[in-house]
Amino acid sequence: MPEVSPAREPISRTYRFVMAVLAPVIRWWGRLEVVGAEHLPTAGPTLLVGNHDSYWDPVAIGMAGRERRQIRALAKSTLWKFPGLAPILDAMGQVPIERGKGDAQALQAAIDTLRGGGCIGVFPEGTISRGKLLRARSGTGRLALEVPEAQLVSVTVTGTVDIVRFPKRPRIRVEFFAPADGPVGDGEEPKAVSVRLMAEIRERAPIALPGRRRTAERLRRAAEDADPRALN
């Protein structure tokens, strides 16, 4: 019998609405370019792994993949504290996570989503880089090991740091691709999975400084003081 493909996951109205509202910023002002969209499956469990240099990265990734599927990102829990934002994030299927605390509840929610055939988006560095070399955290590897049937897809985002640099228009580029070393190997440790995925992603998308000129310069000095290699 021929193999039956998984049913395409419906995209929620709220998700479509938010993407439509933000489209002018990303598609028009940001001149969005999408490469390798075919690597993002339209159905089935998918773990999407990317770099994080700007608050706009999740939006750009969602915009780049919106014709294919709904991406549920692990997002910092403090976003749920903004008035009116929590119900929108919930309706979009986003998953709140306590940063830096090994949030078992959030990871379990992500695992359940993957096992249910959804797409989870993660940033192994855990937060915006702000010009610094951040270590990849083990959570990404844990998700990959807990749901080995999930397809592993990498994504790079560039240009989002320039969105606020008016009147200069940014050129946002989102590229989806399959990791060069393939899926999780036998006996591979969670941290090792996260590290190798992030290393390849950063080769394609080096750390970029967010903010306007003064902010970017302040972040540059702080990054160089912390680690001179960060922006070299």
Predicted regions, residues:
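A transmembrane-helix-recognition feature enriched in membrane-embedded lipid enzymes
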Residues: 2-39, 67, 83-92
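Non-catalytic C-terminal accessory region of glycerolipid acyltransferases
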Residues: 2-14, 104-232
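Short amphipathic alpha-helix with an adjacent loop that forms part of the alpha/beta core around
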Residues: 38-41, 111-112
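Catalytic core of membrane glycerolipid acyltransferases/transacylases, capturing the structured
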Residues: 41-101
